[in-house]
């Protein structure tokens, strides 16, 4: 009995060669619409789908493969006699191979000018149905959704006349993953269009971008998946210009660095980061000076760290970056001379190019945190704050320089692990106290790091001070300006202590915990 293949693809890569080889192996080919036209033009003889069904393609191609003569040929169990008898009685011929990929829905909705009606027209109905029918009956039917699998299938057919069960099972799993991901993108698009923010079911789809040697530690397996609808300003979309493949820890650190630099738009800024905490941030009128400030903030911790810049790297800055050991550099661009310096004798230095761009609110995706048995979903902490909304709660008002430093420190604090303290002036961090289980400990770490630079410095806290002892500790260091959310039942005690020591203190009303 002659074997039959059904071919209907949007992605026509390699399809002519596949069809020619199938014909050479003695297969009949059923095809549809544009696929059949492409094959016939290449000299491959096919059977039109409507010649099989006796029913014309209609409604602009919306109805063409949804027919019992097609799906019966896919779903009939070859090992069940009454299935075969039913097929014979109803003139259903068996189909042994399905090669289908789907309308480009994802690519369509990524176009900036796409209309809702055009998007709806790109929802494939017949294609997923064919894939699911073929995949369900993988005991007898081979289903192929990815052009990269054509050589595997042809190789087995040429060698043994059939595909192995293991291959059919693997390809069926791939087909189900493909249709699930396709539907997830459609569901996400319709959910957004309907303005729904809390769907009763959450379907996420990501594409494998990189298989890694290991994860956070060598004993942990890991892979990197990219969101199916790519975020334009993200580590996943960065272009690597030099160096070894990014590690799991590189990607997490780079993501943290990109999130920070996103908040510093107005002036040239450099962020140095280690273990997802900023160890130095500097801003200036030029990128070289901004680097000088970021480096001076903590010249010890930056060793083996990550640096992200929001301006093109010039030659002078590149020479300074090259002088120390870094894991990774991220910038919107590099001059030709700068790139030559950075790559000289540093073939392992990872260099990424990521054009700096402010994101629209609609482009900022939610954050997902896995927990045992579930998933936490929240908006990113990207609330827009204005100093005009802040309240000075002490007798002394901040002067202009203090206000600039407080704004800089407050912008920084939300990217430091809680309990978080940042000491800064108006152009650089001086001390960072991250991740302690009590606020006093974080204060002491930041003060110790900033020793000798506290004249005119300010301090930011990501959450309120529960007791006035924090203010006493800050006052003892000589710091005269504080910014914090407020909100403690003992705020009055902290305010009284600040007034006693001549400290100006601002309440923002916004907390910035980071776990």
Swiss-Prot record:
Listed under catalytic activity are: (6R)-10-formyltetrahydrofolate + 5-amino-1-(5-phospho-beta-D-ribosyl)imidazole-4-carboxamide = 5-formamido-1-(5-phospho-D-ribosyl)imidazole-4-carboxamide + (6S)-5,6,7,8-tetrahydrofolate; IMP + H2O = 5-formamido-1-(5-phospho-D-ribosyl)imidazole-4-carboxamide
The protein's GO terms of the molecular function aspect are: IMP cyclohydrolase activity; phosphoribosylaminoimidazolecarboxamide formyltransferase activity
SMART domains xref list: AICARFT_IMPCHas (SM00798), MGS (SM00851)
Q: Any one Gene Ontology biological process term?
A: 'de novo' IMP biosynthetic process
Q: Which domain of life is it from?
A: Bacteria
Keyword presence, tRNA-binding: no
Q: In which pathway does it act?
A: Purine metabolism; IMP biosynthesis via de novo pathway; 5-formamido-1-(5-phospho-D-ribosyl)imidazole-4-carboxamide from 5-amino-1-(5-phospho-D-ribosyl)imidazole-4-carboxamide (10-formyl THF route): step 1/1; Purine metabolism; IMP biosynthesis via de novo pathway; IMP from 5-formamido-1-(5-phospho-D-ribosyl)imidazole-4-carboxamide: step 1/1
Q: Which GO terms describe its cellular component?
A: cytosol
**Gene3D superfamilies recorded for this chain?**
3.40.140.20, Methylglyoxal synthase-like domain
MGS-like domain location: 1-145
Q: Which UniProt keywords apply?
A: Hydrolase, Multifunctional enzyme, Purine biosynthesis, Transferase
Note the NCBIfam families from the entry. PRK00881.1 (NF002049), purH (TIGR00355)
Tell me which family the UniProt entry assigns to this protein: Belongs to the PurH family.
Free-text note on domains in this protein's UniProt record: The IMP cyclohydrolase activity resides in the N-terminal region.
Q: What is this protein called?
A: Bifunctional purine biosynthesis protein PurH
């Amino acid at each position: 009995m002659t074997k039959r293949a059904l071919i209907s693809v949007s992605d026509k890569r390699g399809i002519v060669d596949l069809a020619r080889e199938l014909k050479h192996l003695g297969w009949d080919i059923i095809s549809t619409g544009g696929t059949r036209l492409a094959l016939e033009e290449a000299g491959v003889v096919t059977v039109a789908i409507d010649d099989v069904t006796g029913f014309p393609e209609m409604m602009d191609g919306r109805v063409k493969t949804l027919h019992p003569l097609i799906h019966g040929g896919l779903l009939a169990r070859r090992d069940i006699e009454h299935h075969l008898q039913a097929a014979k009685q109803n003139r259903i011929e068996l189909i042994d191979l399905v090669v289908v990929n789907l309308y480009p829905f994802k690519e369509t909705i990524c176009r900036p000018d796409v209309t809702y009606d055009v998007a709806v027209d790109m929802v494939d109905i017949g294609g997923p149905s064919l894939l699911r029918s073929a995949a369900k009956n993988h005991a007898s039917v081979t289903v192929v959704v990815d052009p990269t699998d054509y050589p595997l299938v042809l190789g087995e057919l040429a060698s043994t006349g059939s595909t192995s069960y293991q291959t059919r099972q693997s390809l069926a799993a791939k087909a189900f993953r493909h249709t699930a991901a396709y539907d997830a993108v459609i569901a996400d698009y319709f959910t957004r269009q309907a303005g729904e923010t809390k769907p009763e079911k959450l379907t996420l789809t990501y594409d494998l971008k990189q298989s890694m040697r290991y994860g956070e530690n060598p004993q942990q397996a890991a892979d990197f998946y990219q969101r199916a609808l790519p975020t334009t300003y993200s580590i996943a979309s960065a272009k690597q210009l030099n160096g070894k493949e990014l590690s799991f820890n590189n990607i997490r650190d780079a993501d943290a660095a990109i999130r920070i630099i996103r908040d510093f738009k107005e002036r040239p800024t450099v962020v140095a980061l280690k273990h997802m905490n900023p160890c130095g941030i500097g801003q200036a009128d030029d990128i070289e000076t901004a680097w000088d400030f970021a480096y001076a903030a903590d010249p010890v911790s930056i060793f083996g760290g990550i640096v992200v810049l929001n301006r093109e790297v010039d030659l002078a800055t590149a020479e300074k970056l090259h002088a120390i050991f870094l894991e990774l550099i991220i910038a919107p661009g590099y001059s030709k001379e700068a790139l030559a310096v950075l790559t000289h004798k540093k073939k392992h230095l990872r260099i990424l190019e990521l054009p700096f761009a402010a994101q629209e609110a609609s482009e900022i995706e939610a954050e997902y945190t896995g927990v045992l048995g579930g998933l936490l979903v929240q908006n990113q902490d990207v609330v827009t704050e204005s100093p005009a909304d802040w309240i000075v709660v002490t007798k002394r008002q901040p002067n202009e320089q203090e206000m600039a430093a407080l704004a800089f420190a407050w912008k920084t604090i939300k990217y430091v692990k809680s309990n978080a303290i940042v000491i800064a002036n108006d152009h650089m961090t001086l001390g960072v106290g991250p991740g302690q289980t009590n606020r006093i400990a974080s204060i002491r770490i930041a003060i110790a790091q900033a020793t000798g630079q506290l004249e005119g410095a300010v301090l930011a806290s990501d959450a309120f001070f529960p007791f006035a002892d924090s203010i006493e500790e800050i006052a003892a260091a000589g710091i005269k300006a504080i910014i914090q959310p407020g909100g403690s039942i003992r705020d009055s005690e902290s305010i009284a202590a600040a007034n006693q020591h001549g400290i100006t203190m601002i309440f923002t009303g916004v907390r910035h915990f980071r776990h």
